């Protein structure tokens, strides 16, 4: 896979991290439950860090990170629904990253993507645990 193709995939990943950062930050602002809000705030910070890692990989390969994002469905104050949506976003992100790991033959990129996968799995687990406590 050439650099342009790698950059294209990394920009798709970057877009997902940007959207997650925006959604999680918003949810952390509006959710009254302090424990859940802080958990989501921490995940938002992780997602932003992932953006930095991806931007570094993109620029090292001659590309520019795209700040374009899709439509973000912001939740109102339904904590359970917010957690369900976040679990879904993490699951989708994990699948996308796992697919990209199989497609990309750049050792540095694959190493970073695997690390991000591990963090996304942790987020998903933590969100699931909080959701179970609310049931």
Residue ranges and their predicted role:
Residues 1-135:
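Non-heme di-metal
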